[in-house]
From Swiss-Prot:
Record organism: Euglena gracilis
InterPro entries linked to this entry: GrpII_Intron_Splice-Mob/Def, RVT_N
Subcellular location: Plastid, Chloroplast
Any one of the GO CC terms: chloroplast
Lineage of the organism: Eukaryota, Discoba, Euglenozoa, Euglenida, Spirocuta
UniProt similarity note: To group II intron maturases.
Major localization class: plastid
GO BP of this protein: mRNA processing
UniProt-listed PANTHER family: NUCLEAR INTRON MATURASE 1, MITOCHONDRIAL-RELATED, PROTEIN YKFC
Task performed by this protein: Could be required for group III intron excision.
Gene: mat1
Keywords noted in UniProt: Chloroplast, mRNA processing, Plastid
Name of the protein in its database record: Maturase-like protein 1
Amino acid sequence: MIFYEIFQVSFYQNFLWEKSVRLLFKVQRRLFKVSYIHDKKNLYELQKLIFQSNCARLLAIREVTQLSFNKKISGVDGKTTLNFLERFELNEYLRKNWNNWKPQSLRKRCVFDLNENLISDTISTISDRSWQVLIKFALEPVHEAFFHPFNFGFRYNVPIYKVQQAILLNLSNISFGSKKRILKVELNCNFSIFNYDYLMKKLIAPRNIKLGIFRLLELGFNLHFPENECQISTFSSLLLNVMLNGVENVHNCVRYGYYMLFFLRPMDNEKILANQILSLLYTRGIKKNSSKFLLVSNTKGFDFLGWHFKFSEKVKNGISAIPSLNNYQFFLNRVKRIVNNSNYGSVVKASKLYPVIKNWREYHKYSDLRSLSYSLFFVKKHAFSAFNSESKQDFYSSKRLLFKSFLVSESFNTVSKKYNFHILNCFSFGHLTFLSESINFFNKINLYFCVHCGMKCI
C-alpha cells in the first residue's frame, strides 16, 4: 500500500530528482498492475494520487523547462524560460487547477519536415505543456497495459530494433517468409480532423481530465508523431496510439507510428484486408483518401523505417536487412556537406563527422553492412583527401583525424552476420512489462517491471 505521505516532500529540504523518479515509478507500477486486472476503483485513485503529488508536478515542470527539445520555443505568452520562483508558482497553479484545466490559445508556426515539406504545427505555453506531461504520467501506464504487443511506435518499453527483429522473424524461413506478401499501409501525417468522441471513449481517465483534453483539442491541438525515428513518447503520440490501437487486431502486422506492415499468406485476400482497415479507420474519423496502400512481394524487397528487407537464399534464415537507398543517400549527403564545406577546418570537420557516422552505424548495427559500399571505404578516402589538402595537416595528422571521426566499436554488426533471433533470450519475452525512462543531469535511468512475476531491472 502506498501512502499519501510519501509525496509530501518539503520544499525546504534537499529534493533529489532520482528519489522523485523512483517514487513516481512506484505509483506507476502499481497503476499498471491495477489497470491490467481492470480494477477501475483503485485505478482512478492512483491517477488522482499522481495528479496531487509534488514529485510528479515538479518532474513535469523540469521536463518541459530543462529536458525537452522544444524548451526554447515560446507559446502565445512569449515565455521561453522560468526562474526558480516562477517554477514553484507554476507548481502551485497546477496543484489547484489540474482538475479544471482551461488551456490557453495555441501559437501556430510553419516548419519543414524531414522530406522538406512545409507543415503547420501548434505550440502550447509552458503551463499547458507541463499539464500535458503531468497527464501523460498518469495515462501512460494505464494504456500501456492495453496496447497491442505489435505496436512498436513511440513507446518507452519498445526499442526500434524490435521492429526489425519482428519483421525478420515473420519473413524468415521458419515462418515460410518466401511465400508471403507484404501490404504496406501509410497513414496521413495530418490528424487535424478525427472523431473526438471515439478518442474520449477510449481514454481511461477521470471526467475532468477528459474535459481538459477535449478543450485542448477544440483549440486546434495537432496530434502527430515525432518526425525523427527516436523513441520519444510525447502527449500527442500517446493520444494517437490510443486512437489507433486495435488496428493491429485485423491481421498479423507490425505498426510503427503512421506505418503498418501486414504479412499476407498465399490464401489471404488483400482487397478484403484493405476494406477492413479502411472501415476501422473510418470509425475513428480518418478519411479513406488519407491512407496509402502498397502490395509488394518478399522476394522483390521493400523499404521500412530506413531499412531494406529482401529475401535471399544466401542468408541462413532467408531474409536480409540492409540500409535503404534513400537512407544511405541522405547519410552520404550529410557527410559530403560537412567534408566539402570550406568554412570548416579539418579538426572541426572531424568533430562534426563523428556523431553523424556513429548515429548511422548504431541505427544499422543489426543490419548487414558487409557490402563494400556500406563499409564506408570511399567515404573515408574522400575525407582523408580533404583533411590532407589543408596546409596545417600532414599525412599522419590526417590519419589521426580520420581515425577520430570514423571511430566505431567493433561490436557493431555482430548479430547481423549470423541473423540469430535472440527474442527468446530477452527477459521481457512472454511478460507484460512496463518501462519508466528518466533522464537526469548525469545519466539515464531505466526502470523495468513485469506484471506477472515482478521481475525488475534497473
